[in-house]
């Protein structure tokens, strides 16, 4: 088997002493939240526990904002957008966290999350550089009508970007970002895809975690990534290890990216800090920041296993292949992202 392995110990050496102190301080604050969670779980009518949880969440939010303000390559949606927009982001995250949110509804809110994140990561940065889109309408009386819409011009970035997919949880989010580029571009650009089969060793704990890149089940060409804007869209950034493993491999084989963006729905503080310390050209964009990881390296409070909730669990002894994963999204998703599906199929077959 042709595999590349990165150890967690290789990542922590890049954290500064200030980073480590900040991570420890947030852990200490989150202990108050855990205490309130235990009391609520024991008695759901405990109003004092709920008030304590709300107060703890506010304290943690202020601390995370303070920490992120010192790192200009970590972008948290609710820390950088007007207050009026925070309610929508909070509602989306709450629905995704809810264990009662079913598969189709979970897909819907992931789509909403990545539409917001595309606007924040790309479109909003081009508000001063707009183009006119002339759109035909169905109205023909007294003549065929056309409407003018000014939209951010993202053509240059659309043409230079490659969607780098960390299978399997990042498959649909990457398709969503690609379609946003297509819809914003003046020439219907379909971004190319590079597919990386990577997973954590779930038998390990956060402190000694291994990240395994399976090259035999990955589909990419190094020369097509060199000098490009590499975009990774993964719902969850817990430790940052998977992204770092891939980028280190690419750089060791001569790839020099123009830029790297990691776009998440939820990022843990430690994962965001690690990425920006290890990869000098990387920027992390996240809709929400959660404070800590548990010893299994899962984000707290988190939303569970995003890969399983997006794709369903593998039932057989072998994991599903790319085409099976896409088919399991259902016809509505496949039809909506048909151009992206075709591009992914080309990547796999070639």
Task: Name what the model sees in each region.
Residues 1-350:
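PRPP-associated nucleotide enzymes
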């Amino acid at each position: 088997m042709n595999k590349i392995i990165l150890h967690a110990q290789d990542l922590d050496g890049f954290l500064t002493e200030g980073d480590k102190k900040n991570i420890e301080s947030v852990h200490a604050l989150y202990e108050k939240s855990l205490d309130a969670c235990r009391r609520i779980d024991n008695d759901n009518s405990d109003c004092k526990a709920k008030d304590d949880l709300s107060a703890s969440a506010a304290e943690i939010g202020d601390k995370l904002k303070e920490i992120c303000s010192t790192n200009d390559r970590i972008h948290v949606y609710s820390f950088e957008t007007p207050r009026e927009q925070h309610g929508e982001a909070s509602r989306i995250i709450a629905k995704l966290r809810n264990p009662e949110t079913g598969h189709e509804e979970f897909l819907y809110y992931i789509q909403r999350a990545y539409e917001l994140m595309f606007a924040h990561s790309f479109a909003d940065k081009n508000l001063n550089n707009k183009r006119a889109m002339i759109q035909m309408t169905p109205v023909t009386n007294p003549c065929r009508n056309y409407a003018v819409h000014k939209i951010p011009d993202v053509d240059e970035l659309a043409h230079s970007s490659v969607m780098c997919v960390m299978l399997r949880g990042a498959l649909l989010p990457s398709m969503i970002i690609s379609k946003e580029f297509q819809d914003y571009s003046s020439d219907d650009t379909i971004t190319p895809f590079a597919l990386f089969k990577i997973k954590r060793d779930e038998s390990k704990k956060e402190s000694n975690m291994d990240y395994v890149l399976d090259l035999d089940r990955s589909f990419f060409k190094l020369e097509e990534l060199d000098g490009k804007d590499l975009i990774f869209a993964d719902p969850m950034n817990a430790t940052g290890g998977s992204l770092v493993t891939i980028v280190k491999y690419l750089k060791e084989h001569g790839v020099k990216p123009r830029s790297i963006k990691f776009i998440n729905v939820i990022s843990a503080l430690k994962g965001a800090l690690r990425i920006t310390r290890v990869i000098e050209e990387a920027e992390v964009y996240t809709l929400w920041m959660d404070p800590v990881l548990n010893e299994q390296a899962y984000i707290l409070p988190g939303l569970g296993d995003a890969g399983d909730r997006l794709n369903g669990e593998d039932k057989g002894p072998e994991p599903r292949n790319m085409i099976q994963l896409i088919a399991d999204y259902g016809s509505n998703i496949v039809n909506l992202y048909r151009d992206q599906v075709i591009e992914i199929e080309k990547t796999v077959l070639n």
